[in-house]
Amino acid sequence: MKFFASCAKGLEYLLADELLALGASKATATISGVNVEGALRDAQRAVLWSRLASRVLWPLTEFDCPDEDALYAGVAELPWHEHLSTGHTLSVDAHVSGTAITHARYAAQRIKDAVVDTIRRQGLERPSVDVESPDLRLNLSLRKGRATISVDLGGGPLHRRGWRMAQNEAPLKENLAAAVLLRAGWPRAYADGGGLLDPMCGSGTLLIEGALMAADVAPGLQRYGSDIPSRWRGFDRDSWQQLVTEARERDSVGRAALKQVIHGSDMDPHAIRAAKENAQVAGVAEAIWFGVREVGDLQTRPQATGVVVCNPPYDERLAADAALYRKLGDTLQRVVPQWRASLLCGNAELAYATGLRAGKKYQLFNGAIECALIVCDPIAVPRRTPLAAPTALSEGAQMVANRLRKNLQKFKKWRAREGIECFRVYDADLPEYSAAIDVYQQADGDRRIFLHVQEYAAPATIPEADVRRRLGELLAAAREVFEVPAERVALKSRERGKGGSKYGRFEQRNEIVNVREHGALLRVNLFDYLDTGLFLDHRPLRGTMAQQSKGRRFLNLFCYTGVASVQAAVAGASATTSVDLSGTYLQWCADNLALNGQAGSKHKLVQADALAWLEAERAHFDVIFCDPPTFSNSARAEDFDIQREHVRLLRAAVARLAPGGVLYFSNNFRRFKLDEEAVAEFAQCEEISPRTIDPDFERHVRIHRAWRLTA
């Protein structure tokens, strides 16, 4: 059976790992949650033990839902007397997007009506509504015309552990606190005898969560006590009781063995008082030392190693002070230089203000606030002394370094004139060093440079040892020229095996970097996938379309992460429509639009097979961008082959052009041949490929071809 565990954005991969460790058969991270395969017992175990999940949703039904009548009918088909006992209460949470039903509260009310009417038609007592503590809490997910009705097995938000009696302003949610601790490696550090320190502990969330984690306490034990999370009739009470009994045994053993290695301080005596009250209720007061203390007054800790966790102030209510962040960084380097730090900062600029070198950086959300989590291990990185001579580059690496410097000089004026911050600096210029190197400059914060290195397949006649050596030399040269540490180099290397050369596994860092192109901020992921979310070679064509879209309607087919749509929106397009079969890419597109303040009804996202959608659509557009894949096969659509389907595709796209409109068609199939005779029957067509290649791709002019079509 499949179920869904939701979480805050940025925690998806951590949650997937946690659910697998808890016994799930399969856990796949998606946007703001994890799709899980497992039995009902696995879902109930997650309710009891997950430190990261927000909710655990067990599906009851799924159906097409084009309008409110379909929603009512789909819910009414269920035998609700088998799910809700007589006299029990009901509540519904609803989440809607990309659908004709735009108000979540209205959707929730229609579901309540359907449940109540169904039960009353059976002659049973009408259930009452209790929004605070219902016997059965239902959840509606309505996305793009598809509705899923689920039981919220936890009965509400799982971050509520049951111990928070007092809080200071802007408290940290407990499941986000757990993520900060897990990214810091706190469970392993505790097992190795390390300590835990929070020098700005507020009401104690991080330290209390850390103590309960160290004591092996199930988060759901105190939340539910002797009660059960849900009175849904399908809830397995016997299984739940077995899980609770096991958890209580572990709780007893863990609390008895809990070591007193946890310290917290804060300059606010009211916050410390709240922290002590919360720790008392959580049953860990004796394991945590709390005291009133300024950050700069911290003393050296007795443990040689340990973990610092901290959530410094950063939102509108608690005005962030860069000087405070700097004092925090300086103090930690002085008192716990060899410890590991996991700091949840408001943004990259504040993280940079600490002066600490982040080995890893993650993007998390504290409610609606986007935060930067930096992990420093160790806190104080040894400084290179003037006497230490840098490692000399090999002869081959020096050749690559010289070419990189030459290319940088070559592109300097062009980049300055066009405002280019992301570009290709090397494209197998030296044949024996066969790779592409792309530069991505962070648009915010400390404007860091990231390198994206993609290795090309080497001929089978070249020994593997030589291939590896040359790649190492190329990386060494790139790091020296751009002065970037290894953790800011995303390498997509190839591995030889059966079937030839292929790319190996990528890192799973979930690290998002914001970059800028043509005035638009864009989210790229350099490490987790083969592609980054931004095809640099299409830069000139995107710029042309953005300029032509001002005050006009823009359509982006096979939109990928929606970069062209975002740039058209920023340039002043009256409306944009972005079509892609992938929900993941559409969410990425939505995030890009929101990053630029362009979220709203005039920017439509359509999850559909682009060709089928075109042939059914009746709206017209002024500027259309069509950049299809070479091949595509999906369980949700017919197989697609650009050579076979391009005439049909272009005919359908041209039919959607408004008078005076223009279609830009591009693809990167090397052997593609446009059927000029067939296309001439319905459009005027001009190849514009040379005009769509910027200087950084002049060595690779066949990376794509492009045409301009008008009706």
UniProtKB/Swiss-Prot annotation:
Residues 42-153 form the THUMP domain. SMART domains: THUMP. It comes from the Bacteria. InterPro entries: 23SrRNA_methyltr_KL, DNA_methylase_N6_adenine_CS, RlmKL-like_Mtase, RlmKL-like_Mtase_CS, RlmL_1st, SAM-dep_methyl-trfase, SAM-dependent_MTases_sf, THUMP_dom. GO terms for molecular function: 23S rRNA (guanine(2445)-N(2))-methyltransferase activity; RNA binding; rRNA (guanine-N7-)-methyltransferase activity. Specifically methylates the guanine in position 2445 (m2G2445) and the guanine in position 2069 (m7G2069) of 23S rRNA. This is Ribosomal RNA large subunit methyltransferase K/L. It comes from Xanthomonas campestris pv. campestris (strain B100).
